[in-house]
């Protein structure tokens, strides 16, 4: 049998649809795995066999490699008691198989986790006894293949955090009073006290330890054991240091130590030993101070220290001395110095926003830090137990309490700012969420304190973080997205690839550089012209130098070249065609809005793509990919069976109509037929929002740019009725409803069909258990699950006692607490899940049974829904016209969508116009005549690839970012477009058509730009926003209606609205709004009564909020009274409560409902 071929690169995805690309530049490497950021980091944390093999090969056979968990255990071990007679060592972390599958974890609301075990070894050095045991540490959440975690049944993702790297940072500032430059330096560790040196305006060098009071730097040097002579020998070149030495006021090491202790711990009496211990612990003990590998690397790089200190994670005396020397030389204006190992190093201040000084904490490191916190809490417990337990009977398990560790992990995944609910709106939004970089979170910045500099685009972001994709609003610039080709190195710095250039010859060697390495090289752009031999064609080349400066240099000076034009942008931005013609603000909206697109009923790939669609969909993980080559044996909507070339049968289950986190529909559909030959890496089934293996978030619609009777004013959109009738823009949304039956003080709740005071017609769709049947059409107020709850026993009337005597327990009081469809929701029941204690399902304490009902809703496009293109051109559907009223092409084809021309010029997103032209060409097809004398066609032929001379109708095209179709090419192709079957071209050489008005049959006076644009239906649907209330819950204190759709609240009639009413003199309307329609508790019941009985509406009473105001003032000891017309004080107490209850009882309503979430919504 043929050996199966494992696919390594995704470049040649077998069976991929053909896209005709306008790209001129071939990248020497493929885009790396788009989820590697998450997967690789987690593989390092847990130490998977694949990671070990790869890391060992990179490091060399004789180097010991350690996973993230092994690192922490080694750091922690040994845990010794206070007398150092006993010690506990933890090592060899290992995992058992995961306890449940991903689907089970989602179903049962549990974690997708594997049990973690470590080997614990207890040593009693007095008796020489060693006891070793395997200890269970807890269930450790595992990452799924898609880079997510399942926590309590929901899919979450851990976002990578951008933080300032540990290291040494030099800074310059201007003194406000003397206007002289001052310099300072911070030594920032990963863990431990900060050490700061500075030169002040009095020309002394000072030091601050852990942000306490400043003291002369020579005090610290003397405390470290240096004599005055040694200080003079080292720093004699600096007047600053010599004057500081004279003024420091301490003579020897002991005095210096005591002086430091007094500043660090004011109010405590110092001793030499305690002062020595304080200094040692602050900077020279690994338990208290940790530079981390990355910090040591940065310090050595900056100060030019040799490799002797590579493994030392604390500060050394040499570090401190060299830092001070660098600082005084920087202040003196020197440009370079000789480092201790003899190399010449440049002297300069640091830019904290430079990506050489900011690093990523990826998933693995974030979880590792959390486990470290848990283990250090556990360490304290172990120490205490060593001292309290009998030494003979101690075993490792008796010492270890694993609760703090599992609690720390649980807390991180459940509540950390960086553990987020996965955005599953579509495949792209999930992929982008996993590639997100956040500067927020613990140890990062906060929104309020982050200034403009840190949010701004920095030259070092090039090829590392996308300059376009970031949220609008308070988080702008603090949250970014990883660029397409970027990867993260072991230190957490982002690297981007470059091609090596030797004497103007471009090679295919690719090197990855961090931002500070890149600064040392001269780098050309990817679109620099070169010939077929890969040599530059121009003598002088435009290049990028340090700090983002652009210069023109001779080609021999170029060191490297970008690998691809789309290297600087993220995946979502790289999916915007003609990005180079869009204003950056609109491109930002376009990149963000693609993530809000709802998967449609039938996905359709864009006519105009960028070539990124295939890769993004492939790596997002929502499609089914064949792992090995073979032949398809069986295909159905539910599963696909493939017999691979080794004779092994693989079955792939398709996920059908599942609910995502955002309530969109997750459905997979097969692409292959029985008997098909499939290769390794071929797509077997499409996911939501993919078409034939490509990302397909919207629909290709025939667009005309024209105003239409003012109905598309201000970005409104006019749609063809066909979009509704043929379900072109229809999506499916699934809602989940959950109810549980608990034990209450009065007895257990019961899920039943036997509900009091409910007619048989209401129960028609419930089965014998009281649960709605699958397939039932339900609307708001319908019962989904019948449930009754015992009522409190009250004093029985004689009649009830008689009934109780005759029927026994049957007449026991229960109330209806059934789960009903919420207000405004409709749909079809597509799934029911029942969990009960009897079936041994894991349920929360006190819960006997839980039922989940899934209701699907088919939402057609309607007025008020939001549509958008990929260029930030968004709008709301303003009118849906019948097909016959839409403008139509000369051959009778009606337009699908009319966009206003005013939406283009001032927004400067011209990309949408070019997309429309190329969309028309892709739909109509084109054939270029190479012998044509037309100058436009001649100009086009200079750049158009030969394989694009003839393209059939209904083809897919790709115009990659910064390397796509040029204006000249589009202009030439519009002259070469194919006619329709009648032999007529519908669109002229300028991409315009003479449209005819569907209502009158008259042609419009001017030609109109017509073509195909890819339009997305966004998740801002009018169905989810529209809301109305008649009666509903009221706030407990003010008795005013609650606010918002979620609380079934009312509309706020605010201060400005009140003024408007006053201005119009609408006194009675205003009084009604502020009393009986709001918080006049008695009045609103009387009004309801009057409406029911058909009487006149009574006069309003006193609003409840006025009474609250009085009470507030009285609580401030102000004796505020309300006086009647005759001057006597009025009592505002609620005498009307009885009246209220009588009215409520008589009318069968409750208009004084409080804000309890289960307060009944319906007026019976």
Swiss-Prot record:
Enzyme class: transferase
Keyword list, A-Z: DNA-directed RNA polymerase, Nucleotidyltransferase, Transcription, Transferase
A biological-process GO annotation: DNA-templated transcription
Cellular component per GO, a single term: DNA-directed RNA polymerase complex
Pfam families: RNA_pol_Rpb2_1, RNA_pol_Rpb2_2, RNA_pol_Rpb2_3, RNA_pol_Rpb2_45, RNA_pol_Rpb2_6, RNA_pol_Rpb2_7
Enzyme Commission no: 2.7.7.6
Keyword Chloroplast (UniProt): no
Listed GO MF terms: DNA binding; DNA-directed RNA polymerase activity; ribonucleoside binding
Catalytic activity as recorded in UniProt: RNA(n) + a ribonucleoside 5'-triphosphate = RNA(n+1) + diphosphate
Compositionally biased residues, Basic and acidic residues: 981-991, 1152-1164
HAMAP family according to UniProt: RNApol_bact_RpoB
Family: Belongs to the RNA polymerase beta chain family.
Listed name of the protein: DNA-directed RNA polymerase subunit beta
Organism the protein comes from: Corynebacterium jeikeium (strain K411)
Lineage start: Bacteria, Bacillati, Actinomycetota, Actinomycetes, Mycobacteriales
């Amino acid at each position: 049998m043929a050996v199966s071929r494992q696919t390594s690169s995704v470049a040649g995805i077998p069976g991929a649809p053909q896209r005709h690309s306008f790209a001129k530049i071939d990248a020497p490497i493929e885009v790396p795995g788009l989820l590697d950021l998450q997967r690789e980091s987690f593989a390092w944390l847990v130490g998977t066999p694949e990671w070990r093999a790869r890391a060992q090969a990179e490091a060399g056979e004789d180097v010991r490699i350690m996973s993230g968990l092994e690192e922490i255990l080694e750091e922690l071990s040994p845990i010794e008691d206070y007398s150092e007679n006993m010690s506990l060592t933890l090592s060899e972390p290992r995992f058992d198989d995961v306890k449940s599958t991903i689907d089970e974890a989602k179903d049962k609301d549990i974690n997708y986790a594997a049990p973690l075990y470590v080997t614990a070894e207890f040593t009693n050095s007095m008796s020489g006894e060693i006891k070793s045991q395997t200890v269970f540490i807890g269930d450790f959440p595992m990452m799924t293949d898609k880079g997510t975690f399942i926590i309590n049944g929901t899919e979450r993702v851990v976002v990578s955090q951008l933080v300032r790297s540990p290291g040494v940072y030099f800074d310059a500032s201007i003194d406000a009073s003397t206007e002289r430059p001052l310099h300072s330096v911070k030594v920032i560790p990963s863990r431990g006290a900060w050490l700061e040196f500075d030169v002040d305006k009095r020309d002394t060098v000072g030091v601050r330890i852990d942000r306490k009071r400043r003291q002369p730097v020579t005090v610290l040097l003397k405390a470290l054991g240096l004599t005055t002579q040694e200080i003079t020998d080292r720093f004699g070149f600096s007047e600053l240091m010599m004057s500081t030495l004279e003024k420091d006021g301490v003579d020897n090491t002991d005095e210096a130590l005591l002086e430091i202790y007094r500043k660090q711990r004011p109010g405590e009496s110092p001793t030499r030993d305690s002062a020595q211990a304080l200094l040692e612990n602050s900077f020279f003990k690994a338990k208290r101070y940790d530079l981390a590998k990355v910090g040591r690397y940065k310090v050595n790089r900056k100060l030019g220290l040799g490799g002797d200190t590579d493994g030392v994670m604390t500060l050394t005396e040499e570090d401190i001395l060299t830092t001070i020397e660098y600082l005084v030389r920087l202040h003196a204006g020197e440009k370079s110095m000789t480092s201790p190992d003899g190399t010449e190093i440049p002297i300069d201040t640091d830019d904290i926003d430079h990506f050489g000084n900011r690093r990523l904490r990826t998933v693995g490191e974030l979880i590792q830090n959390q486990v470290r916190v848990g283990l250090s809490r556990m360490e304290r417990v172990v120490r205490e137990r060593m001292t309290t337990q009998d030494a003979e009977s101690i075993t490792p398990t008796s010492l270890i309490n694993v609760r703090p560790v599992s609690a720390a992990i649980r807390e991180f995944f459940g509540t950390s700012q960086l553990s987020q609910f996965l955005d599953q709106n579509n495949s792209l939004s999930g992929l982008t969420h996993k590639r997100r970089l956040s500067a927020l979170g613990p140890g990062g910045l906060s929104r309020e304190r982050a200034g403009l500099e840190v949010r701004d685009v920095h030259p070092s972001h090039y090829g590392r973080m996308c300059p376009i994709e970031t949220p609008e609003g308070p988080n702008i610039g603090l949250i970014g997205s990883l660029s397409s080709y970027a990867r993260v190195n072991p230190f957490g710095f982002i690297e981007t690839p470059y091609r090596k250039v030797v004497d103007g010859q471009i090679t295919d060697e690719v090197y990855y550089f961090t931002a500070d390495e890149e600064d040392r090289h001269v780098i050309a752009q990817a679109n620099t012209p070169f010939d077929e031999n890969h040599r530059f064609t121009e003598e002088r080349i435009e290049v990028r130098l340090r700090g983002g400066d652009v210069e023109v240099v001779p080609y021999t000076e170029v060191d490297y070249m970008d690998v691809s034009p789309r290297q600087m942008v993220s995946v979502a931005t790289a999916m915007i065609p003609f990005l180079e013609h869009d204003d950056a603000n609109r491109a930002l909206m376009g990149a963000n809005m693609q993530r809000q697109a709802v998967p449609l009923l039938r996905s359709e790939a864009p006519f105009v793509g960028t070539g990124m669609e295939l890769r993004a969909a492939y790596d997002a993980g929502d499609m089914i990919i064949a792992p090995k080559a073979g032949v398809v044996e069986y295909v159905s909507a539910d599963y696909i069976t493939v017999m691979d070339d080794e004779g092994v049968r693989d079955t792939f289950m398709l996920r059908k109509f599942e609910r995502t986190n955002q309530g969109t529909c997750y459905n997979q559909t097969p692409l292959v037929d029985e008997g098909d030959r499939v290769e390794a890496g071929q797509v077997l089934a499409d996911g939501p929002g993919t078409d034939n293996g490509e990302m397909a978030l919207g629909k290709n619609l025939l667009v005309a740019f024209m105003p239409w009777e003012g109905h598309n004013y201000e970005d409104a959109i006019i749609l063809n009725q066909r979009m509704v009738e043929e379900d072109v823009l229809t999506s499916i949304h699934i809602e989940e409803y959950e109810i549980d039956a608990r034990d209450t003080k009065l007895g257990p709740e019961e899920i039943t069909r036997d509900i009091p005071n409910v007619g048989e017609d209401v129960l028609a769709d419930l089965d014998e258990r009281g649960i709605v049947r699958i397939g039932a059409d339900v609307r708001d107020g319908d019962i989904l699950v019948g449930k009754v709850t015992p009522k409190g026993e009250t004093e029985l009337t004689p009649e009830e006692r008689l009934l109780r005597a005759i029927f026994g327990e049957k007449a026991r009081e229960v109330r209806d607490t059934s789960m009903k469809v919420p207000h405004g929701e409709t749909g079809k029941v597509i799934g029911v899940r029942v969990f009960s204690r009897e079936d041994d399902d894991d349920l929360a304490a006190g819960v006997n049974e839980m039922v989940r009902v899934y209701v699907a809703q088919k939402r057609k496009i309607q007025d008020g829904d939001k549509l958008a293109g990929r260029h930030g051109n968004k709008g709301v559907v303003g009118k849906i016209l019948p097909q016959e009223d839409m403008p139509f092409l000369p051959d009778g084809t009606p337009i699908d969508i009319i966009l206003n021309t005013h939406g283009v010029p001032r927004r400067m997103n011209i990309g949408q116009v070019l997309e429309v032209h190329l969309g028309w060409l892709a739909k109509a097809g084109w054939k270029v005549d190479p012998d044509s004398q037309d100058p436009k066609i001649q100009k086009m032929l200079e750049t158009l690839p030969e394989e694009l001379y003839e393209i059939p109708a209904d083809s897919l095209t790709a115009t990659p970012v910064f390397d796509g179709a040029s204006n000249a090419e589009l202009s030439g192709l519009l002259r070469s477009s194919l006619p329709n079957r009648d032999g007529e071209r519908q669109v002229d050489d300028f991409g315009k058509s003479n449209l005819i008005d569907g209502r009158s049959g008259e042609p419009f006076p001017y030609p109109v730009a017509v073509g195909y644009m890819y339009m997305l239906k966004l998740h801002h649907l009018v169905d989810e926003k529209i809301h109305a209330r008649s009666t509903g819950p009221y706030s407990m204190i003010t008795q005013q209606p609650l606010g918002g759709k979620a609380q079934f609240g009312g509309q706020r009639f605010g201060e400005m609205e009140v003024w408007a009413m006053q201005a119009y003199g609408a006194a009675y309307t205003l009084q009604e709004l502020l009393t009986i329609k709001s918080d006049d508790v008695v009045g609103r019941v009387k009004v309801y009564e009057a409406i029911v009985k058909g009487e006149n509406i009574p006069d309003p009473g006193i609003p409840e909020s006025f009474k609250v105001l009085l009470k507030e003032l009285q609580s401030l000891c102000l004796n505020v009274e309300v006086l009647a017309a005759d001057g006597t004080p009025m009592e505002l107490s609620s005498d009307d409560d009885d009246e209220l209850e009588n009215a409520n009882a008589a009318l069968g309503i409750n208009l004084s409902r409080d804000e309890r979430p289960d307060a009944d919504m319906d007026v019976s």
